[in-house]
């Protein structure tokens, strides 16, 4: 298999990254160790190479109105310098992917450009789907990453580190806010233009940065010199799972609706605009989904993994979608689907792990919330 390499691939290897195939890319699963990386992000700061993810630019007349036909979230709620999390839907309300939409316009009344970040595993199919539905309306799609670097800097010290390196004040940038920042000392072109968004996939404060390859390599080395430890896919998974953030392809897929996945807050049925799957979701909103994604805590140290059966009265009633040992909580946690009648907080079920039944309790999500910044 010919795996793709990000511009930081050799730097990840040099930093001790243990590389594994992931969504067609050769990516680091860990560096110093999952526990150390996890704790660094929770307590200080860590960085992730996420350059495998897809980044598309949408340009034309009112691209937001055109994209609106494919997502259930009211995109008019965001303006220039703002972003939102949403999902791409098919005709039956099934989730094709989750994504973040960034408004790159100069004013809310005349937004001509959007940036969207999509999952690596869905990048090709998403692009085909978007072109099929957006290009006939005159919206042009292009690769905004352009073989560049997408870097996540996450943790309570992320703001201080990034302010020190950039010379910019970033503390006031709101969650899901974004801006272009001019960085000095990142290569031949001085200054380098860096897209910075206050977004992430860890449950911590932090930023995601999009920049050209050479500037990204220089920034990686500067962050290493600052003592920021590199983190791999392993700790990214334990961090996102503690925060109960969905992983597409495991916790939701084309056969899952937002209401089933606990993402009903993304569905804005009060807006008049039509969107893909609206009729199906209106019906499900009225009747209620027959199953729901739940958070689970297991007694003991056994780990529930994707696909493990969920049992009630010794009968299979659902499946685990994601599970891990939580370094922050010292408990085994998991996400999974249960019939709505069994999905209430406090309900007891069991997980079948290697032929044995392990008690589990339905709990409130997320499992972990970062301490208040105040």
From Swiss-Prot:
GO molecular function, one term: aminomethyltransferase activity
One of the record's GO cellular component terms: cytosol
Keyword Secreted: no
Reaction equation(s) it catalyzes: N(6)-[(R)-S(8)-aminomethyldihydrolipoyl]-L-lysyl-[protein] + (6S)-5,6,7,8-tetrahydrofolate = N(6)-[(R)-dihydrolipoyl]-L-lysyl-[protein] + (6R)-5,10-methylene-5,6,7,8-tetrahydrofolate + NH4(+)
Listed InterPro entries: GCS_T, GCS_T_bac, GCST_C, GCV_T_N, GcvT/YgfZ/DmdA, GcvT/YgfZ_C, TrmE/GcvT_dom1
Record has Transferase as a keyword: yes
An annotated GO BP: glycine decarboxylation via glycine cleavage system
Gene3D superfamilies for this protein: Aminomethyltransferase beta-barrel domains, Aminomethyltransferase fragment, Probable tRNA modification gtpase trme, domain 1
Chain segments annotated as transmembrane: none
EC number(s) on file: 2.1.2.10
Function: The glycine cleavage system catalyzes the degradation of glycine.
PANTHER family: AMINOMETHYLTRANSFERASE, AMINOMETHYLTRANSFERASE, MITOCHONDRIAL
Record family assignment: Belongs to the GcvT family.
Annotated protein name in UniProt: Aminomethyltransferase
UniProt source species: Prochlorococcus marinus (strain MIT 9303)
């Amino acid at each position: 298999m010919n795996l793709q390499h990000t511009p930081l691939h050799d730097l990840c290897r040099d930093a001790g990254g243990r590389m594994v195939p992931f969504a067609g890319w050769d990516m680091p699963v860990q560096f110093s160790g999952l526990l150390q990386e996890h704790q660094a992000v929770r307590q200080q700061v860590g960085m992730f190479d996420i350059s495998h993810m897809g980044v598309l630019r949408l340009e034309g007349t009112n691209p937001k109105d055109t994209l609106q036909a494919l997502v259930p979230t009211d995109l008019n709620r965001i303006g220039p310098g703002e972003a939102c999390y949403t999902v791409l839907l098919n005709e039956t309300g099934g989730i094709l992917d989750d994504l973040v939409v960034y408004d790159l316009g100069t004013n809310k009344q005349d937004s001509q450009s959007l940036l969207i970040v999509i999952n690596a595993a869905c990048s090709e199919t998403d692009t085909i789907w978007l072109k099929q539905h957006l290009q006939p309306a005159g919206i042009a799609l292009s690769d905004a990453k352009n073989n560049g670097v997408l870097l996540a800097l996450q943790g309570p010290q992320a703001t201080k580190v990034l302010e020190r390196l950039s010379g910019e004040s970033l503390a006031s940038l709101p969650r899901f806010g974004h801006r272009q920042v001019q960085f000095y000392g990142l290569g031949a072109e001085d200054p380098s233009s860096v897209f910075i968004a206050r977004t992430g996939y860890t449950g911590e404060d932090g930023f995601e940065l999009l920049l050209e390859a050479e500037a990204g390599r220089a920034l990686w080395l500067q962050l290493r010199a600052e003592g920021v430890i590199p983190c791999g896919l392993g700790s990214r998974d334990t961090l996102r799972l503690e925060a109960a953030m969905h992983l597409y392809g495991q916790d939701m897929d084309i056969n899952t609706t937002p209401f089933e996945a606990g993402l009903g807050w993304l569905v804005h049925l009060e807006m008049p605009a039509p969107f893909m799957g609206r009729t199906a979701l209106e019906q499900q909103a009225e009747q209620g989904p027959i199953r729901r994604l739940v958070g689970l805590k297991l007694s003991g140290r056994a780990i529930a993994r994707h696909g493990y059966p969920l049992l009630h009265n010794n009968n299979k009633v659902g499946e685990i979608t994601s599970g891990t040992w939580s370094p922050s909580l010292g408990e085994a946690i998991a996400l999974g689907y249960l019939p709505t009648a069994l999905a209430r907080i406090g309900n007891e079920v069991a997980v079948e792990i290697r032929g044995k039944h392990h008690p589990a309790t339905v709990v409130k999500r997320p499992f972990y919330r970062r301490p208040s910044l105040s």
